A protein has these predicted regions:
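Non-catalytic interaction-recognition regions
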Residues: 1-148
Length: 148
């Protein structure tokens, strides 16, 4: 909670919100996105046999492209955060990543045994999202559980 605010901004700590297991709690929201991806990757390995060669050009949907673009901003975002000494910006960025992931996940079938190539490309997008979330959370000193 403290990391999600600027150093000079006023904070009224809400203990009920800190305990809340919903999207209203920013830490829970980020951890939930990571756990959701972990669960999806386990299901993928059960439902899809083998991995085809990767073809990321299959990712053409607006939500897929938006998420991929957001993930590509991570190195620049880290540079910005470190130069400004504002971890709040990393927290905000990670919330944007989690939100984009949830939108993508809600709108598209990631695991489709009838379309293994697209499923594999989407799996790779999910894996990249998990890496960004896990690394970002670690930098902020927040755990990234695989189950919730």
């Amino acid at each position: 909670f403290f990391i999600m605010r600027g150093a000079n901004s006023h904070l009224d700590f809400d203990l009920d919100l800190a305990k809340d297991e919903s999207e209203k709690n920013p830490v829970y929201y980020l951890q939930y996105a990571n756990a959701r991806i972990s669960n999806l990757l386990k299901r993928y390995d059960k439902d899809i046999v083998g991995d085809p060669s990767i073809n990321l050009s299959l990712l053409k949907e607006k939500d897929e492209i938006s998420l991929a673009k957001l993930l590509s901003e991570f190195p620049n975002k880290m540079d910005e955060v470190s130069k400004a000494l504002e971890p709040r910006k990393l927290g905000t960025y990670l919330e944007d990543v989690a939100s984009a992931y949830h939108k993508f996940y809600g709108n598209h079938k990631v695991i489709d045994p009838q379309n293994i190539e697209l499923s594999f490309a989407r799996k790779k997008l999910c894996e990249a999202t998990k890496i960004i979330l896990k690394n970002g959370l670690s930098i902020l000193g927040i755990t990234a559980p695989d189950k919730m």
